[in-house]
Design a protein with these regions (language model features):
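Extracytoplasmic gating/loop element in the C-terminal half of outer-membrane beta-barrel translocons
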Residues: 287-362, 367
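Residues on the lipid-exposed face of transmembrane beta-strands in outer-membrane beta-barrel proteins
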Residues: 92-96, 130-134, 182-186, 198, ...
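Extracellular loop and loop/strand-boundary signature of outer-membrane beta-barrel proteins
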Residues: 115-118, 165-170, 222-228, 264-270, ...
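Transmembrane beta-barrel strands of outer-membrane/channel proteins
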Residues: 77-81, 114-120, 144-154, 159-162, ...
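Outer-membrane beta-barrel translocator domains and adjoining extracellular loop/strand segments
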Residues: 127-132, 156-164, 206-215, 252-254, ...
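Sequence/structural signature of outer-membrane beta-barrel proteins
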Residues: 97-101, 119-125, 137, 151-155, ...
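Outer-membrane beta-barrel initiation region
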Residues: 24-145, 220-252, 323, 336-340, ...
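Outer-membrane beta-barrel translocator/channel fold
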Residues: 144-186, 300-320, 395-399, 404-414
Length: 416
């Protein structure tokens, strides 16, 4: 085949291969491009569309929006606010805000709020309480309230006094008490509050109902445990000063809280149990880069003092142990005239509704201030998990370790 024939064949093949491409018009290119852009827009819209909240998310949102109250009209479920050793509580509360007013206004002068509670626990503890508040008295930043509370605490623990008390000394007693009181709170400036109280108390000690342990009366002498019998009624007067700049009192992520309170408790027609008490507490939240990681630092001390030969009733003496102080020990594990404790927690948001924490607690009790020594400091440590809504903690599980073993503490932040 000649070179001319070869050139003709190559040219024909080239023209044939180009012909289909040249057959695509500009209109076809525009339509194809428009379809591709539409598909990309649909895909992006699907990615940006909000996901449907889960059942847990909807429940926690409801918990936040409804003030953490299982409520129907003025009635709501309540757990009673008992101490950690009381067991699971259940009951009903009636709360009415702005009584006689069609609108609940937090700034309304002389606004009247009322509350009533009746609760019980699975261990037989009982509580009945009523409160009446008058807010913004006379249009001033002053609140006053009157209250009444009747308690039957059936299985309170007592291990003896001092840091040397042992688990073998565990006993239980019953504390029945009625309290009538009046309080006032003055808010001179936004973070500051100044408070005062006047209370009348009628405590009565009996034998505990926890059959797992002996009663306090059966293994301790009345002479060695002040207040175990022959108690008078008491009058308590007190004053407090607090500074609170936390962003939330139930689930703080930044800020601090500092409080000092002093009280005088005097027996009615019997001065043998008169005493004074000073309480100091501080909390500081330190954000670590953002609101999802933080340090929660706390410290507190409770100091009592009596004149002459007077004794402080044992059940009014400060104690350590349980969820609020030393989590690696049982409730009220250590008791004496003075107590101090501190805590550090590293908290982070493991999930939007779940915080996790590593913590260390340390504390000590002593009969005299001079007896506070590092040698007697008790230390516990562990890990905790707290289910929460945006502003409120719902429940928590802390697993704490101490020299007496591992203590799991399940707590619900709910109630009156």
């Amino acid at each position: 085949m000649s070179s001319k024939h070869i050139a003709a064949v190559v040219m024909a093949l080239a023209i044939g291969s180009v012909a289909p491409a040249s057959a695509q018009t500009p209109a076809d290119d525009s339509a194809r491009r428009a379809a591709e852009l539409a598909a990309e827009r649909d895909k992006k819209a699907e990615e940006l569309a909000p996901s449907k909240p889960s059942l847990v998310e909807r429940a926690l949102h409801w918990y936040d929006s409804n003030g953490a109250k299982l409520q129907w009209r003025a009635f709501r479920f309540a757990m009673g606010g008992f101490t950690g050793g009381a067991g699971l509580g259940y009951g009903v509360a009636i709360a009415e805000q702005g009584m006689g007013s069609p609108v609940v206004d937090p700034d309304q002068p002389n606004r009247i709020d009322g509350e009533f509670l009746a609760a019980r626990t699975i261990r037989g503890y009982q509580r009945i309480a009523a409160k009446m508040h008058v807010l913004n008295l006379g249009g001033l930043p002053v609140d006053v309230s009157v209250r009444w509370q009747d308690d039957q605490l059936m299985q309170e623990d007592f291990y003896g006094f001092g840091p040397g008390s042992t688990e073998a000394g565990r006993s239980n007693y019953r504390l029945d008490s009625s309290e009538y009181g009046a309080d006032f709170t003055w808010r001179p400036a936004s973070p500051f509050t100044i408070g005062g109280e006047l209370s009348y108390l009628t405590p009565l000690i009996g034998e505990g109902t926890d059959t797992r342990y002996p009663t306090t009366q059966s293994i301790y002498d009345v002479e060695d445990v002040p207040g175990l019998s022959d108690l008078p009624s008491f009058v308590r007067t007190g004053a407090s000063l607090a500074f609170d700049w936390r962003d939330s009192d139930s689930h703080p992520r930044r800020g601090g809280y500092y409080r000092v309170a002093a009280a005088q408790t005097s027996g009615v027609n019997d001065a043998s149990y008169d005493f004074r008490r000073l309480d100091i507490a501080a909390q500081q939240i330190v954000p670590l880069g953002n609101r999802y990681r933080r340090l929660n630092l706390q410290a507190a001390a409770a100091l009592t003092d009596s004149s002459g030969v007077n004794d402080v009733p044992f059940f009014y003496q400060p104690s350590l142990g349980g969820l609020r102080t030393l989590r690696g020990f049982s409730e009220s594990r250590f008791r004496d005239r003075h107590a101090a404790w501190a805590r550090a927690e590293y908290q982070w948001e493991a999930w939007w509704a779940l915080d996790a924490a590593f913590f260390v607690d340390a504390g000590q009790v002593a009969s005299r201030l001079s007896e506070f020594t590092l040698h007697d400091v008790e230390v516990t440590y562990g890990v905790g998990f707290r289910m929460h809504a945006n502003e409120r903690v719902v429940a928590g599980l802390d697993i704490a370790v101490s020299r007496e073993g591992v203590v799991p503490i399940l707590g619900f932040r709910y109630g009156f």
